[in-house]
């Protein structure tokens, strides 16, 4: 059997560091093939794990730490020495690409320690590969691995209990983890959400055009706190969210946001909202919601300083801004990113 870790014959010189970026939700056999190929061209491979510190969803079912562990296990299983593998965890920044690029660069530089002998590993296959052009300082080494396999296909089989199909698509170490996770309470929650979302999308599949849903949300701040609600239904059960929802047929966006703020939090109607409107913005990242194409218009209401108003709804709470910004994994969809946007504006 050919040694998949030996340098490629007649190839370019071996780089000190390689960088391979992905979400790996979960890592599959094509990911492993790319990594093994890369390790024939570089001394050490820095694996950048995206969508870190996000809430578990059917699209992002595993934590960055879990993905790191199973990647390390599958590479060790393939005969790769652990010191040759380095990891970086990077959050999603749906509305600030510069922050994402900066976090990738900082994470990589923490390992390279000033070395410029860095190559970026990847395959430009569609619009999702745009990031490969975003690091001009790193030589681009295209992978020769060609595969139709995707993590989406693996997840679909996993949440539809086709575990035999899953075993054919992932390395043994990954399959062992998935079988164990399949018995965990987290899997049951994710499976319930997967089934809910599938039925939700099925309900409008016969529409003449794919629907675009319109929602309005309120970011309400007061004395260093932000008003949040804890979702009690699917999708996103027990996740923190801004109060908000679908726009009614006979109301403006602002009216919808104010109605949802009061209705979901129990904020006293004597507290004005419209006069405390500080800013507003449309958030339309195409994949921001697993329910389907959803565009939201968010309004920032700044209630100034003073005692925190009483909230009569049991699922509503005031959270210190520092705590909210430090815990993106607690939030539903892109709500953390939306709140972060308004807070960064000052």
Task: Tell me what each language-model feature is.
Residues 240-251:
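Short histidine-centered catalytic/ligand-binding loop motif
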């Amino acid at each position: 059997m050919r040694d998949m870790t030996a340098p490629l014959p007649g190839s370019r010189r071996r780089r000190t560091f390689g960088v391979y970026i992905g979400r790996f939700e979960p890592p599959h056999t094509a990911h492993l093939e790319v990594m093994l190929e890369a390790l024939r061209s570089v001394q050490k491979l820095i694996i950048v794990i995206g969508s870190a510190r996000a809430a578990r969803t059917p699209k992002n079912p595993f934590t960055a730490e879990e993905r790191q562990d199973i990647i390390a296990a599958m590479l060790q299983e393939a005969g790769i020495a652990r010191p040759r593998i380095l990891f970086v965890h990077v959050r999603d920044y749906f509305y600030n690409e510069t922050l994402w690029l900066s976090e990738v660069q900082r994470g990589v530089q923490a390992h390279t320690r000033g070395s410029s002998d860095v190559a970026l590993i990847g395959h430009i296959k569609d619009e999702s590969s745009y990031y490969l052009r975003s690091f001009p300082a790193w030589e681009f080494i295209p992978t020769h691995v060609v595969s139709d396999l995707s993590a989406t296909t693996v997840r679909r089989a996993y949440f539809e209990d086709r575990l035999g199909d899953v075993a054919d698509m992932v390395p043994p170490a990954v399959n062992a983890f998935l079988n164990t996770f399949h018995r965990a309470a987290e899997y049951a929650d994710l499976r319930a959400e997967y089934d809910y979302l599938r039925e939700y999308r099925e309900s409008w599949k016969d529409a003449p055009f794919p629907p675009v849903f319109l929602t309005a949300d309120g970011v309400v701040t007061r004395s260093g706190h932000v008003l949040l609600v804890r979702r009690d239904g699917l999708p996103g059960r027990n996740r923190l969210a801004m109060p908000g929802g679908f726009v009614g047929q006979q109301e403006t966006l602002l009216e919808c946001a104010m109605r949802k703020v009061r209705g979901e939090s129990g904020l006293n109607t004597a507290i004005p909202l419209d006069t405390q409107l500080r800013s507003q913005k449309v958030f339309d990242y195409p994949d921001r919601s697993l329910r389907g194409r959803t565009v939201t218009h968010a309004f920032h209401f700044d209630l100034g300083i003073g005692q925190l108003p009483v909230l009569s709804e049991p699922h509503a709470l005031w959270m210190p801004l520092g705590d909210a910004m430090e815990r993106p994994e607690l939030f539903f969809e892109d709500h953390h990113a939306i709140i972060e946007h308004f807070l960064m504006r000052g």
